[in-house]
C-alpha cells in the first residue's frame, strides 16, 4: 500500500521520523546516526549548538547540510516566551530566512515540562511574524486545539518527560489529540526504544521526534536504524487496521470441514 507524504506547513516529506542532534560523542557519530535513521528533518537547539554563530567552533551544518536535510531550529533551553521568540529570530537570520521552527517553552529545569501559557504567547507572536510553528506541548487535547486554531502547523505532545525514556504514558489523550487535529500530530519526547516509536505510530500519529533514545543508546547507529524500522512498521500497522480486541478466545481454525472427527 502506497502511503501519502507527511505534509508540514508548505513542505512534504517521506520519512516520518524526525531526529535531534544532541548528546552524541562527536560530529561523526551524529552524521552516521542521522543517516541510519533515514530522517529528512533534523532539529537543532539554537542556544546550544553552533550553526554559524561562532566561526571558531565546528559547525554542525557541515554534517547536516541544509541542501540535504530540512533543518528544524528549536528553542530548547527557553523558559519564557520572549527568549523563545528571540531564539527563533536568530535562527531565521542564521538560516537565511528559514521560517519553519520547533517552539518549546519549558516550565522548569527538573521536568522540562512545557509551560503552556508562555508557549501560547510565543506562538501567537511568531505566527504573526510569519513563522511556521511546530509546537512542543502537553498532552492536553484542549491546549492542542487552541494551538492549532491559532495557526501552528504541527502539534507535538510529549509522550513522557524529555529524556526520560518512559515511552507513551497517556496513549488515550494522544489519540484524542490526533482525532481532533487537522494538522500533523507528532509525539515529541519520552521515546526510549523502538516499541515506543511503533506504539506512537499505531495510535495514528503522523510522526515521532526523538534524540536521547538514539544518542544515549549503547550503539546509536544501530538504534537509529531500529527506530526507522519501528516508525515504518507502526505506520503500516495503523494503515492496515488492527483486529478488534475481544474478551474471549476466537479460534483461528474453522469449526466446519474437519478431516477427522
From Swiss-Prot:
Subcellular location as annotated: Cytoplasm
A GO biological-process term: thiamine diphosphate biosynthetic process
One Pfam family cited in the UniProt record for this chain: ThiG
GO cellular component: cytoplasm
Known role: Catalyzes the rearrangement of 1-deoxy-D-xylulose 5-phosphate (DXP) to produce the thiazole phosphate moiety of thiamine. Sulfur is provided by the thiocarboxylate moiety of the carrier protein ThiS. In vitro, sulfur can be provided by H(2)S.
PANTHER family per the UniProt record, alphabetical: THIAZOLE SYNTHASE (PTHR34266:SF2)
Name by which UniProt lists this protein: Thiazole synthase
Gene source species: Acinetobacter baumannii (strain ATCC 17978 / DSM 105126 / CIP 53.77 / LMG 1025 / NCDC KC755 / 5377)
Amino acid at each position: 500500500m502506497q502511503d501519502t507524504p507527511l505534509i508540514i506547513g508548505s513542505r512534504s516529506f517521506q520519512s516520518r521520523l524526525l531526529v535531534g542532534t544532541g548528546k552524541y560523542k562527536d560530529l561523526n557519530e551524529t552524521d552516521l546516526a542521522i543517516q541510519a535513521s533515514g530522517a529528512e528533518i533534523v532539529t537543532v537547539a539554537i542556544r546550544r549548538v553552533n550553526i554559524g554563530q561562532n566561526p571558531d567552533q565546528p559547525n554542525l551544518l557541515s554534517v547536516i547540510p541544509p541542501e540535504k536535510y530540512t533543518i528544524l531550529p528549536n528553542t530548547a533551553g527557553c523558559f519564557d516566551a520572549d527568549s523563545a521568540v528571540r531564539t527563533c529570530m536568530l535562527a531565521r537570520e542564521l538560516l537565511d530566512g528559514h521560517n519553519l521552527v520547533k517552539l518549546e517553552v519549558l516550565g522548569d529545569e527538573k521536568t522540562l515540562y512545557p509551560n503552556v501559557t508562555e508557549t501560547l504567547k510565543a506562538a501567537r507572536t511568531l505566527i504573526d511574524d510569519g513563522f511556521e510553528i511546530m509546537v512542543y506541548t502537553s498532552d492536553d487535547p484542549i491546549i492542542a486545539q487552541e494551538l492549532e486554531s491559532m495557526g501552528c502547523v504541527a502539534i507535538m505532545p510529549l509522550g513522557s518527560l524529555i529524556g526520560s525514556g518512559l515511552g507513551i504514558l497517556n496513549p488515550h489523550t494522544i489519540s484524542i489529540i490526533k482525532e481532533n487535529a487537522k494538522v500533523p500530530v507528532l509525539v515529541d519526547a519520552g521515546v526510549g526504544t523502538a516499541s515506543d516509536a511503533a506504539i506512537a505510530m499505531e495510535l495514528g500519529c503522523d510522526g515521532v521526534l526523538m534524540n536521547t533514545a538514539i544518542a544515549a543508546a549503547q550503539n546509536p547507529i544501530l538504534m537509529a536504524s531500529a527506530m526507522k524500522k519501528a516508525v515504518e512498521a507502526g505506520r503500516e500497522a495503523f494503515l492496515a487496521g488492527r483486529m478488534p480486541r475481544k474478551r474471549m478466545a476466537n479460534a483461528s481454525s474453522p469449526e466446519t470441514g474437519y478431516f477427522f472427527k
